[in-house]
Amino acid sequence: MLKSMSALAATLAISAACLTLLPGGKRAEAQSAGMFVNAVDLDIVPAEREKYLAAIKENGAAAAKEPGCRRFDILNLGSDPNHFFLYEVYDSEAAFKAHRETDHFKKYMAITGKMVAKRESRQMSVIAANAK
């Protein structure tokens, strides 16, 4: 639990700084409120790590191209090569739900089902994003 909570806290702190930036480095503080975040903590079966990485990179790249997806970050806990954290930001909960209906998401879930030893996800609404 501590590992997942510390990963969550670190990721949220790092990502909050990036959340308010639009392409070209323009700030979007007013647009950040109301956005929707999906944060996922994952422990991967060690023997499946490389296959998992290929699958999540493919899914993340496709997700980032979806209308309504602001970012899709794939992070690895440095002290544990098999512990990953996904940080996904969408314009709305509806955009997140649309993501879960895409062919690439369904493919990712089908391929990685047995690769994941533990999955814990949280959905959150952005109240405010503060960054310099």
State where each predicted segment sits.
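N-proximal accessory regions
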Residues: 28-37, 41-53, 90-93, 127-129
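Short amphipathic alpha-helical segments
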Residues: 48-70, 104-108
